[in-house]
């Protein structure tokens, strides 16, 4: 399976690391090119030395247009001119979010495109589906361009799918307690859209927006107009937490809800949803490959209300779902 990565920032590098990790035991994925406008000597350094996920287990260097990782050589570029032979291009730059702009990759020769973000703009949702692996990926019908939704949507969708089926969700509110990202500022500096995100990321708790709850209906259509939410950015480098409050049509108790989640973690959602019984904290989940990790002691119920809290590595978990989805699309 031949993969091309466009954009070699946090997600692009995590995607490559995830592929390298999988290929150590089951070599099926071949990255045949990476594109990013940045200096490739610096990008090679950043791939090997990661402040969050640690040192790569192979030496990395750049030479003569190639990223050399141990004995592996990957052609790298500062612009894309040809994608012939590419099975799936994973778009990680954050710059091309409208489906029509992603069609350019098909014109250059790629067979399929996977976007590492929600789609923007007006588009046909059947032609350009939003899929969350483990929740609705089985609805894929060989479309050429797919959105992998957001890291937060990947975290809440498995929970909502389970609870809506069992209890019927009437409405819900989401708070994502989210580690800061490159969209914020290291020191106080003007943000183009958001006053609060203009403030120093590592020194403040910063309320801002998220479209994860509003966009959930693109994955679970039954929840359209039933969900809303916001984000609170916190001074941590990685790992986030969902605080999901739901009103259910049926009365629910803590133990039956947790039992449903635990059963799913061992069956249909194994590798996507995990259960934490050790009362761990955020740093314990760095480099956890699951989409969400539920702490059963942080499930609370009151009549028809339920609050569920879950951890997710917003970089590594999401990047692993991108690889899962790319493989699924390719082998469809």
From Swiss-Prot:
InterPro entries named among the record's database cross-references? GlycerAld/Erythrose_P_DH, GlycerAld_3-P_DH_AS, GlycerAld_3-P_DH_cat, GlycerAld_3-P_DH_NAD(P)-bd, Glyceraldehyde-3-P_DH_1, NAD(P)-bd_dom_sf
Instruction: Tell me the residue numbers annotated for binding NAD(+).
Output: 10-11, 36, 81, 116, 314
Catalytic activity, reaction form = D-glyceraldehyde 3-phosphate + phosphate + NAD(+) = (2R)-3-phospho-glyceroyl phosphate + NADH + H(+)
Give compartment(s): Cytoplasm
Which GO cellular component terms are attached? cytoplasm
- UniProt xrefs under SMART domains: Gp_dh_N
* Highest taxon of source: Bacteria
Q: Keywords assigned by UniProt?
A: Cytoplasm, Glycolysis, NAD, Nucleotide-binding, Oxidoreductase
Active site (catalytic residues): 151 (nucleophile)
Q: Per the similarity annotation, which family is this? A: Belongs to the glyceraldehyde-3-phosphate dehydrogenase family.
Q: State the oligomer form and interacting partners.
A: Homotetramer.
Q: What is this protein called?
A: Glyceraldehyde-3-phosphate dehydrogenase
Q: Which organism is it from?
A: Helicobacter pylori (strain J99 / ATCC 700824) (Campylobacter pylori J99)
């Amino acid at each position: 399976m031949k993969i091309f990565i466009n954009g070699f920032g946090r997600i692009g590098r995590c995607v490559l690391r995830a592929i390298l990790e999988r290929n150590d035991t089951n070599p099926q994925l071949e990255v045949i090119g990476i594109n990013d406008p940045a200096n490739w000597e610096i990008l090679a350094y950043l791939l090997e030395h990661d402040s969050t996920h640690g040192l790569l287990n192979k030496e990395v260097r750049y030479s003569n247009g190639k990223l050399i990782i141990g004995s592996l050589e990957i052609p790298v570029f500062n612009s894309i001119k040809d994608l012939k032979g590419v099975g799936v291009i994973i778009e990680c730059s954050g710059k091309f979010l409208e489906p029509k702009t992603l069609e350019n990759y098909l014109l250059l020769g790629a067979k399929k495109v996977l976007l590492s973000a929600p789609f923007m703009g007006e588009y046909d949702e059947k032609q350009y589906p939003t899929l969350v692996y483990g929740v609705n990926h089985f609805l894929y019908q060989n479309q050429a361009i797919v959105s992998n939704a957001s890291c937060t949507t990947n975290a809440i969708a498995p929970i909502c799918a389970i609870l809506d089926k069992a209890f019927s969700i009437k409405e819900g509110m989401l708070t994502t307690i989210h580690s800061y990202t490159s969209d914020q500022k290291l020191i106080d500096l003007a943000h183009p859209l958001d006053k609060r995100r203009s403030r120093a990321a590592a020194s403040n708790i910063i309320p801002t927006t998220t479209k994860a709850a509003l966009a959930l209906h693109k994955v679970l259509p039954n929840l359209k107009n039933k969900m809303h939410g916001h984000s609170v950015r916190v001074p941590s480098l990685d790992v986030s937490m969902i605080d999901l409050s739901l009103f259910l049509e049926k009365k629910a108790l803590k133990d039956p809800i947790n039992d449903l989640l635990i059963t799913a973690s061992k069956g249909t959602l194994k590798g996507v949803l995990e259960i934490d019984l050790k009362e761990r904290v955020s740093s314990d989940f760095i480099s956890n490959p699951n989409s969400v990790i539920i702490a059963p002691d942080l499930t609370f119920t009151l009549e028809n209300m339920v609050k569920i809290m879950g951890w997710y590595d917003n970089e590594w978990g999401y990047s692993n779902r991108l690889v899962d989805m790319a493989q699924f699309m390719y082998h469809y």
